[in-house]
Amino acid sequence: MSLKSKLSSNRNPYVVAQQKTFRLIKKYRDEGLSVYNLIFMQVESPLRSNDFFIKKVCIAAKYKKKIIVGNINTYRDYSWVTEIIKAIFLTSNLKAQDYFISAGKKMSGKKILKKAYSLSNLNYKNYFSSNKKYFRINENEILIGSVKNSFYLKNKFNFSFKIFGDRLIKEMYKSL
C-alpha cells in the first residue's frame, strides 16, 4: 500500500473516519495550514487492548491457553509503537504533506501463532483453532506498506524499522 492506493470500500466506522479525516486534512492544507496526514499499518504496543491479534496470541501462548482465531493465512505489516513514534517525530520536521509510515515487511497470522507459542516451548498446532465467524468479510489477504516508504525514511533520516517479525513478537511476549 502507498499514498496512491485506492481508498478502501470497507464501511467499518473506523475506516470511514480515517478516510474523512484524510480528505479534511488535505482541505486544511489547501487553505494554508501546516498539517500532516500520517498513515500507518498495524501499530503494536503492550498498551493496546488484549483483543489486538499479536497481544491476544502472546497472552494465550505465555499462559499456555488455547485460542480461537479467524483466518491465519492473511499477511499484515506490523510495526512497534516506539519506532512509529520516532518516525512521526522525524517526519514532523519535513514539509507538511501526506506520509505513509510502515516497515514494509509482511507477517502471517500463522507465523505469529507459531513464534508466540514457540516462546513457551509449545507447538502452536495444539493450542489454536480457527473459526469462520472470526473471518472478516471482504478481507484483503495481504496488506503491507510499500517498501518505498521504508526506503524514503532510510534515505532521508538513516532510519529503518528494527522491530518486526520474530523480534516484534518477542517484544510483545516479554512485555506481558
Model-derived segments and spans:
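Ser/Thr-glycine-rich phosphate-binding loops at phosphate-binding pockets of nucleotides
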Residues: 1, 17, 171
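Flexible, glycine-rich beta-alpha linker
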Residues: 3-13, 36-56, 75
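Alpha-helical hydrophobic/aromatic positions enriched in membrane-embedded helices and signal peptides
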Residues: 7-10, 31, 72, 86
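Residues in soluble alpha-helical coiled-coils and helical-bundle/repeat scaffolds
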Residues: 30, 48-49, 159
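C-terminal substrate-binding subdomain of Rossmann-fold SDR/epimerase-dehydratase oxidoreductases
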Residues: 61-176
